[in-house]
Each structure stands twice: as structure tokens, then as C-alpha cells.
Amino acid sequence: MPARHYSLRDIALSRLNITDLPLNGLKRVERQRLGDERGFLSRLFCAEELSAAGWQKPIAQINHTHTTRCGTVRGLHFQYPPHAEIKLVSCIRGEVWDVAVDLRRDSTTFLHWHAERLSENNCRAL
């Protein structure tokens, strides 16, 4: 049986599964993998799907961080309005324990937190 190779149509049909989480405004984005004997492909970003799920701002930047030692703590990301940014955090190699804390005083989930393991294998982002 010949190997299956994925077409541009298959790639276009790859979807992001977007789920609301207990923190107000926090979402889990799970990428669908399309794979064959060569490896896999997954959609990292789709403006249309994210917009339909409530993504309100355009992407301002994309960063890549490399951590050399296990157990490293990176820090807390927070900006006061009007400089607040929407972040999409994922892990492309290894794994990370990602924790989100709601620091917005006017939020119904103020001081609540949510944590998930993000990894190269589960294709999740928060």
C-alpha cells in the first residue's frame, strides 16, 4: 500500500480545537496533527478560527524561548491596559508546566489559577 501524503486541501482542513477554561478569557488551543511516515504537520495559527473563538486583537509578535535546564522558572507575564497583550503559549520541544493566574481585579475569576502541561506531543497551547 503506498504511503499517504497530505495535500494542501488536507492541510486547509486541519482544525484548531479551542476550549474555554475555568479562568475568564483563558482558552486551550489543541492543534490537530496530520501525519505519515515522514512525520507530521499541524496548523499553528488560523486567524479565522481564533477570531470565531473570541480572539480580539491582531498578532503583534511571535517569540521563541529556549530553556537549557529542567526546572527553570520563567516568570509572570502581565501588562496593564492599554498595553495588555493576548498571549498564546505552546511548547515545541520537551514540556512545560504553564500556569495562568487572573490578576484582573474586576474579573469574576480574580486570583484564581489554572495550570496545564504543554508539550511537543500534546500540541496544546494556552
What are these regions (language model features)?
Residues 2-121:
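Non-catalytic, conserved peripheral segments adjacent to functional cores
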Residues 124-126:
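Short, intrinsically disordered, charge-balanced linker/junction segments flanking boundaries
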